[in-house]
């Protein structure tokens, strides 16, 4: 059984618990599914069951259509193919945030690594036999791109952007902001391992997050957790 199949089964089982009431206490509504080539799990504590599947799906679709490299028609995919230079608010904010992190890390973090990740077969790309790394490195550099007046400027049109390292965290923030507008104050959001928590869980305690132990052979999510 591969990891994707395992995740699907786990998600299906977890979805059964949606809207479960914990004794005489509050209700915890659960929402699970797939987005951006990964999974998401959301828990919301409230006085009664919440039916927000369509709203959450709409938010996730909006982000997917903007930043997902797994979606060939997303705005980011089109930017990488130079079919447009217009950016939306999601991409502009992620590029600004990424640049700040790149500057703080002296360039150790860099979202322009897409030519390299593509050459080695990440995000669904076909690996290149014996890639010319030196040539590809000339297309990498966070200071070679900028957003000006809603448009992406590249020093070289062959440059490409990979937001996978930041997109899922931004998605969690986006959903959290939506909950805040609705007055929802206690929830846990996890998108592709990027987590946003607020308030307490149904037992009145801080949310507890399990992380797969990083050891060889631990391929099944949830099989060996460290808390």
Predicted features and spans:
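Mature catalytic core of soluble alpha/beta enzymes
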Residues: 2-8, 16-227
């Amino acid at each position: 059984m591969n990891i994707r199949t395992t995740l699907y089964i786990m998600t299906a089982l977890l979805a059964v618990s949606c809207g479960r009431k914990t004794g005489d206490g509050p209700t915890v509504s659960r929402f699970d599914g797939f987005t951006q080539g990964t999974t998401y799990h959301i828990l919301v504590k409230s006085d009664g069951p919440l039916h927000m599947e369509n709203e959450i799906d709409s938010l996730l679709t909006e982000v997917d259509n903007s930043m997902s490299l797994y979606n060939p028609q997303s705005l980011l995919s089109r930017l990488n193919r130079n079919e447009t230079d217009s950016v939306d608010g999601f991409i502009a904010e992620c590029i600004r945030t990424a640049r700040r992190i790149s500057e703080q890390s002296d360039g150790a973090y860099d979202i322009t690594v897409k030519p390299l990740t593509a050459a080695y077969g990440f995000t669904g790309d076909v690996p290149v036999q014996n890639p010319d790394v030196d040539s590809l490195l000339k297309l990498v550099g966070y200071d070679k791109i900028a957003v000006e007046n809603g448009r992406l400027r590249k020093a070289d049109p062959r440059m490409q952007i990979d937001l996978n390292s930041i997109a899922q965290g931004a998605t969690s923030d986006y959903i959290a902001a939506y909950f805040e507008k609705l007055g929802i104050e206690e929830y846990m959001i996890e998108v592709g391992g990027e987590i946003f928590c607020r308030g307490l869980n149904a037992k009145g305690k801080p949310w507890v997050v399990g992380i797969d132990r990083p050891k060889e052979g631990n391929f099944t999510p949830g099989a060996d957790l460290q808390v």
